[in-house]
Regions:
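Membrane-interface catalytic loops of GT-C/OST-like multi-pass glycosylation enzymes that act
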Residues: 2-8, 53-63, 177-181, 240-254
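Alpha-helical transmembrane segments of multi-pass inner-membrane proteins
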Residues: 5-77, 84-88, 98, 204-211, ...
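A conserved mid-to-late transmembrane alpha helix and its immediate loop/hinge
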Residues: 6, 53, 138-141, 147-150, ...
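Transmembrane alpha-helices of multi-pass inner-membrane enzymes
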Residues: 23, 65-69, 226-276
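Transmembrane signal-anchor hairpin modules in multi-pass inner-membrane enzymes, especially those
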Residues: 28-39, 79-83, 215-224, 266-276
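Hydrophobic transmembrane alpha-helices and their immediate junctions
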Residues: 69, 73, 78, 82, ...
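A membrane-periplasm/extracellular boundary helix in multi-pass inner-membrane enzymes
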Residues: 75-123, 138-146, 154
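Membrane-interface loop/short-helix elements at transmembrane-helix boundaries
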Residues: 112-162, 175-185
Length: 276
């Protein structure tokens, strides 16, 4: 599970699709769900966790943990497993961390990068030894200012980044194809108008789902099928993370597939409730 080709992306696939496996028994084998879930779910959790850690992907590991904790917090029947999940997570992570030298170096590097970002944010914004991702994020602002309201056009960040004002020609750092964050990319390429349209749509969908699922009496309260899609959608649109390109990779296909299924499940339950 180390890498696919030259890219450290295997962990991202595990993070995005592993959550569904936890719901296979309740959905398709409800008769055996209670009997076997306590055995299979921990095994699956350990397999996926080990796979993500060994893949070398740091962000997918954080997102995988974030997804699990969201489900444990919002699903009442799962809250009793919170402490055991934390314990299992800690044992697996630190065991691999101490045994595998590559994993140790990988996460020490990640820790160092996070510290550098915090130090730059709090003390010196011009710190010369910026982590690579922070340099990529910082190219966004001047590029966005060139076309604040309507953007520079889809897939044009790679062009305008080199034409932005205040660019330092003597610096070796070269602009990337995108700023490695969905929201920054959408801002630079579609402007404030495109950004607001997309954000309003996401917030509206998220509010509708959560309100119907967790805060009022609704058919969705008992809908197990919708649970993984809700939390995968939340994690996918979570703003504080590094991402691939929104417009040029399979990320958007995955996001809108999740979105379409969510809307379909909501509309189905609303239709059933109205008929009743």
């Amino acid at each position: 599970v180390d890498r696919l080709g030259d890219e450290l992306i295997a962990g991202g696939y595990i993070q995005r699709f592993s959550i569904f496996s936890f719901f296979i028994l309740p959905l398709f084998y409800s008769k055996y769900s209670v009997k076997y879930s306590s055995f299979f779910v921990p095994i699956l959790f350990i397999i996926f966790l080990v796979g993500i850690i060994l893949s070398g992907n740091r962000m997918p590991l954080l997102l995988f943990i974030f997804t699990l904790f969201l489900m444990l917090i919002f699903q009442k029947q799962l809250r009793k497993y919170l402490l055991s999940t934390i314990l299992m997570l800690s044992i697996v992570f630190f065991s691999i961390y101490n045994i595998n030298e590559n994993v140790k170096k990988n996460f020490l590097s990640f820790y160092s990068q996070v510290n550098s970002i915090v130090e730059i944010a709090l003390k010196d914004n011009n710190f010369k030894e910026k982590p690579q991702y922070l340099k990529e994020f910082s190219t966004f602002y001047d590029t966005w200012l060139m076309h604040k309201y309507i953007g520079g056009g889809i897939k044009n960040f790679r062009y305008y980044c080199h034409e932005r004002p205040n660019i330092k020609k003597d610096v070796k750092f070269v602009c990337n194809m995108h700023p490695h964050n969905y929201y920054l990319e959408i801002l630079t390429e579609t402007g404030l108008f495109g950004f607001l349209i997309l954000v309003v749509a996401f917030v509206n969908i998220l509010y509708t789902i959560f309100y119907n699922k967790y805060f009022i009496k609704h058919n969705l309260n008992e809908n197990i099928m919708i649970i993984p899609f809700i939390f995968l959608f939340i994690v996918e649109i979570f703003p504080i993370k590094s991402t691939g390109s929104f417009f040029t990779t399979g990320n958007t296909t995955y996001l809108f597939l999740i979105l379409g299924i969510l809307i379909g499940l909501i509309q189905r339950d609303i239709s059933i409730e109205k008929k009743i």
